[in-house]
Amino acid sequence: MSRLPAALRTYRLLAAVAGPLTPVMLSRRVKQGKEHGGRLVERRGLARLKRPEGRLVWLHAASVGELASVLPLIARIAERGIGVLVTTGTVTSGGLAEQRLPRGVIHQFVPLDVPRFVRRFLAHWRPDLALFVESDLWPNMIVEASTRRVPLILINGRISEASYRRWTYLLGTIVDLLGRFDLCLAGTQGDAERLSALGAPRVIAAGNLTLDVPAPPAGAARLAALQSAIGSRPLVAAASTHPGEESALIDAHRRLRADFSGLVTLIAPRHPERGAGVAELAAAAGLKASLRSRGALPDATTDIYVADTMGELGLIYRLSPLVFMGGSLVRHGGQNPIEPAKLGAAILHGPHVWNFAEIYAALDKSGGAAQVDDGDQLAGRFSAWLHDDTARERAAKAARETVESLSGALERTLAALEPYLMQLQLPRRTDHA
């Protein structure tokens, strides 16, 4: 590549200068529960494990959602006998990696985007191919991998309208970064057009891999126990909620319980460590809340059941006939609606869903989902669907059929990756530099 743009040079300089300050920052994040205290060395580019022999694909997925979307892809690559290293950046994604990665696939927390940390990481793992998921584009990681001539591919690529507008103010930087990618596989046609406009040289609209991920599992015993505890009481659920949304849900519950005796509202905060705070909000509103993390099941007096545990959304989506998807009444961009749609739930969401705009648009158009703009509309739609089983079931059926019609991204992605994966299975002619 030619000389780096000024903004990118400045970023690299500041990141290098910040390197000595990272121990203090990481220590603070450990106290906040945002880092794995026993694995901080990985954030500085050090490895706990040896590099496996042979060719190695490095796949980077920022967090839980991104990792979940590529689990089937990881399995298909590993089945070919190619080594796979997966990096993620959050404690919760590390937990998911431990639970769900195929045997033999290595997980490491991604190094902070400090040049010497990234170089240390690359020198140890020596990847033969790098796959970046969605939009987690760390400049030093991309520049250093490109400098080592590692082929770079963006998979499930996503650039929202808001991100696109922001990047236009740093056009030279994003053109440089995307120009280092051999291939960008976009999640939607809109993403493909935005990636091309920002300088990606080769873009294919392969589709959203999340649509091909199997529905999340639910342990039969746990499902039966929770179903038994709730019994025939009316139930609504809210998944992956963010601060500011739980108060609207609690207020909706207070307004609805007069019409729906025994109503249970199940709230699964996006970050489980916020569970106790959600319970306090309910108590302040005069409602009784119980926390799943403490082993509680809802009893006859429970109003708000807080599912502050990891890996149980599959259970929640199977239980609740209708689900509000969080991150959408507040300006977060929305959470992924595909899993509840696959499991037969009618879906509600707020207006702020730019992270999954095209999927929500398809669901809304088919009647599988409905938008609510505030707490009043949320309570009203909950009430309408609780009163009308036929309308709710029709919406759930439309949601399921919509996501089924949009599937196929996994095979298209594998087809696009085939030349690169085939190359890794050929005898090595020279050692990796």
Located regions from the model:
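Nucleotide-activated sugar donor-binding and catalytic core shared by glycosyltransferases
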Residues: 1-433
